[in-house]
Amino acid sequence: MALEFTDDNIKEIIESGKPVMIDFWAEWCGPCRMVSPIVEELAEEFSGKVEIGKLNVDDNIQTPNEYGIRNIPTILFFKDGKMVDKQIGATPKASLKAKVEALL
């Protein structure tokens, strides 16, 4: 199951030492709903290896502003506490999986 990231816990998760994938989304966003099951599947596949979760941009305003998120879905990838990749828009599972594997 994908983690629930918030403005309050995001820094701690990014700085945990594990690779991180964050899906910035909103309930009203159609493309976000298309990506959501893919994020859940990847969270299960990479459980224990990569912290994979979602951050609701309507409930958490600070973090999207810090990373310049203007469109959703946007997915950010972190390694060693630094952002190393970014994907904007609905993306096929194979593409996202390759980006997650590149974090390992």
Please annotate each region the language model reported.
Residues 1-51, 59-104:
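Proteins that catalyze or organize thiol-disulfide redox chemistry
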